[in-house]
């Protein structure tokens, strides 16, 4: 993976999300996995089984933290109690970088527990970038923001989603967690060219890539993480890594979770694209 300041100058390969149904298999069979991604909020506790399991994983594998509730796009201040808990976990996992979503989801201390799309305005970009910088400085760790899937748009938007992403990461001087499936989902819902999106992303800021499956519901495509990756998403992934180089890639599978072996096998499909890129870079 091309080393850059947004992934802590580390080289990771292909990972999968650490999920409860797979704990027993992992501990009994000790499969060869490049790294696991954990949802930070699942481990913000003072003790008990979650941390005991995590410590067992950390003894054998590398881990990267992925958050779901920073809500950089919300107008209220960052929750510093939450940040302190995140920082405690960071010290435990030694994650080389931390990711969360480019979205909003809270108002006046009330949380939606959802990843809501942003209005693509210059003011929203300014507020969001300031909060990303604040979190990065507090955590003393590189941060990468993830593009979310969306099913609605704001009339007040002043730019495209990819222009907004670029505006935020430039102002925040942060990395990108490039979710290729989310780009595909949103492109189908909002009728834009996903390759134009990928071609606009600043390659030097991509710290990590997500791939996943999705579902169709009536006229919308939903980012459900409950199916294998479809061919059009693999084609986008291939295009993405040709632009950014071999990059830490994570398969998300969060619902209707099959066996560990099936998830692992699906994730390893990403590997067939990497040798081509590595040869091209020689």
Language-model segments: what does each one mean?
Residues 47, 77, 115-121, 125, ...:
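Gly/Pro-rich active-site loop or hairpin
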Residues 79-176:
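Active-site acidic/histidine proton-transfer and metal-coordination neighborhood
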Residues 1-88:
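N-terminal pre-domain/capping segments
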Residues 36, 98, 143, 179, ...:
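Conserved, mostly hydrophobic/aromatic
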Residues 25-31, 48-65, 81-96, 133-138, ...:
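Acidic (Asp/Glu)-rich catalytic clusters
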Residues 260-281:
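C-terminal helical cap(s) of enzyme catalytic domains, especially alpha/beta-barrels
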């Amino acid at each position: 993976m091309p080393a850059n300041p947004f992934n802590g100058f580390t080289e990771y390969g292909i990972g999968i999300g650490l999920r409860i149904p797979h704990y027993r298999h992992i501990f009994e069979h000790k499969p060869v996995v490049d790294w696991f991604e954990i949802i930070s909020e699942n481990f913000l506790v003072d003790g008990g089984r979650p941390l005991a399991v995590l410590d067992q994983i950390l003894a054998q594998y590398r881990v990267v933290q992925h958050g779901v509730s920073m809500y950089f796009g919300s107008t209220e201040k960052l929750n510093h109690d939450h940040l302190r808990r995140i920082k405690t976990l960071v010290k435990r996992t030694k994650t080389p970088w931390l990711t969360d979503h480019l979205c909003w989801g809270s108002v006046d201390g009330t949380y939606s527990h959802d990843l809501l799309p942003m209005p693509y305005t210059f003011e929203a970009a300014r507020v969001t970038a300031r909060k990303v910088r604040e979190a990065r400085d507090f955590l003393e760790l590189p941060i990468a923001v993830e593009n979310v899937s969306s099913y609605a748009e704001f009339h007040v938007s002043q730019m495209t989603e990819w222009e907004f992403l670029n505006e935020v990461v430039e102002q925040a001087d942060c990395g990108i967690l490039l979710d290729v499936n989310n780009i595909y989902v949103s492109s189908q819902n909002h009728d834009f060219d996903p390759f134009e999106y990928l071609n606009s992303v600043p390659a030097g800021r991509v710290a990590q890539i997500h791939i996943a499956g999705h579902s169709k519901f009536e006229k919308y495509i939903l980012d459900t993480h409950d199916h294998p990756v479809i061919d059009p998403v693999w084609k986008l992934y291939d295009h993405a890594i040709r632009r950014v180089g071999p990059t830490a890639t994570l398969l998300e599978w969060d619902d209707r979770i099959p066996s560990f072996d099936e998830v692992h096998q699906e994730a390893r499909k990403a590997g067939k694209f990497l040798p081509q890129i590595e040869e091209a870079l020689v």
